[in-house]
């Protein structure tokens, strides 16, 4: 098999079960996924960093042997998550083509450095998932540690961020943070992980399509021959048939086009946006100056800065106006 090149294909699709549970389940899932002809890399969790002890924490080394068999069976590269230097050593011993650092590991610079040190000199693709908490510096720092270790085949995985309170998603995507990472590291492929963003099958297609619309470079999606009986994350995994249907539904658009009519229309609209932005900033500046004057008046009259009634009336007024102007109330 040729050495894996993460930039050789777009979109890059990585799929497989959340966990390698048994040899039969692993091989049959990988066989069916490969048969779709839409997947580029097979994945399976070998070591599972669970939130609470007592949950299934992976089968360990024998799972790597199963994945090696899956590679022989399908001809596809294999990948898995690592969390310690021992995991790295085992993955390299079995010739794993793609490894990734999980969200629970990215938050810890000591763990990331331990992995980076173990990877020195290795010719393997390394993907870095965003940290659990929305701290872009931790994400950037993990990339820097890998680069300092001489790792050149790097990529990013956006899997969403933990958020307190009720949410539509298991992990809030916070798309703006992933977009900021793309600005910082434009040369690195960005892969979306809708399985972990959603936490269920309901919104997988919607999130996957949005990532495609945002010019992501691929997807990593969990698939299992019998998702409802999976030993981990059952609700977010698709059957291989479901995976194929989802992948065929995604529309991957071009980043740009040389069409003269497109370029002219876009230039005209962008000029309008630039003008509107300038007007908005001018109005914001004027508002800030008025707000400063209000603050001085309150100070001179020994009145608190925040007055709840006034603030709520502003919020209510703006929210009520939003639908009339075609703006989301969110």
Question: What are these regions, as identified by a protein language model?
Answer:
Residues 1-14:
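N-terminal amphipathic alpha-helix/helix-capping segment at the start of soluble metabolic enzymes
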Residues 43-61, 225-234, 294-303:
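Glycine-rich, proline-tolerant flexible connector loops at the mouths of alpha/beta enzymes
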Residues 56-80, 115-125, 175-190, 236-256, ...:
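Alpha-helix-loop-beta-strand connector modules within alpha/beta enzyme cores
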Residues 57-59, 75-84, 88, 97-111, ...:
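Catalytic beta/alpha-barrel core
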Residues 255-330:
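Domain-level signature for soluble enzymes in the chorismate/prephenate branch of the shikimate pathway
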């Amino acid at each position: 098999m040729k050495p894996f090149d993460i930039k050789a294909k777009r979109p890059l699709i990585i799929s497989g079960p959340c966990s390698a549970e048994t040899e039969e389940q692993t091989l049959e899932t990988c066989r069916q996924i490969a048969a779709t002809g839409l997947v580029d890399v097979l994945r399976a969790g070998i070591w599972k960093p669970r939130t609470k002890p007592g949950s299934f924490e992976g089968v360990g080394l024998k799972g790597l042997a199963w994945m090696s068999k899956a590679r022989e069976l399908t001809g596809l590269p294999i990948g898995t998550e690592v969390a310690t230097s021992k995991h790295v050593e085992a993955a390299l011993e079995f010739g794993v083509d793609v490894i990734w650092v999980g969200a629970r590991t990215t938050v810890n610079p000591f763990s990331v450095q331990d992995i980076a040190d173990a990877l020195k000199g290795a010719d393997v693709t390394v993907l870095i998932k965003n940290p659990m908490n929305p701290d872009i510096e931790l994400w950037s720092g993990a990339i820097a540690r890998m680069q300092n270790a001489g790792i050149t085949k790097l990529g990013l995985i956006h899997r969403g961020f933990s958020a307190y309170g009720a949410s539509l998603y298991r992990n809030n995507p916070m798309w703006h943070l992933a977009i900021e990472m793309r600005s910082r590291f434009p040369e690195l492929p960005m892969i979306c992980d809708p399985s972990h963003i959603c936490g269920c099958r309901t919104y997988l297609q919607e999130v996957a399509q949005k990532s495609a619309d945002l010019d992501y470079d691929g997807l990593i999606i969990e698939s299992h021959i019998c998702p409802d009986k999976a030993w981990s994350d059952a609700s977010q995994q698709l059957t291989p048939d479901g995976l194929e249907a989802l992948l065929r539904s995604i529309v991957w658009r071009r980043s740009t086009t040389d069409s003269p009519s497109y370029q002219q229309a876009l230039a005209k609209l962008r000029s309008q946006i630039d003008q509107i932005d300038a007007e908005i900033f001018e109005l914001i500046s004027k508002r800030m100056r008025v707000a400063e004057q209000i603050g001085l008046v309150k100070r001179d009259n020994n009145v608190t800065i925040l007055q709840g009634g006034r603030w709520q009336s502003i919020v209510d007024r703006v929210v009520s106006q939003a639908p009339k102007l075609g703006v989301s109330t969110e």
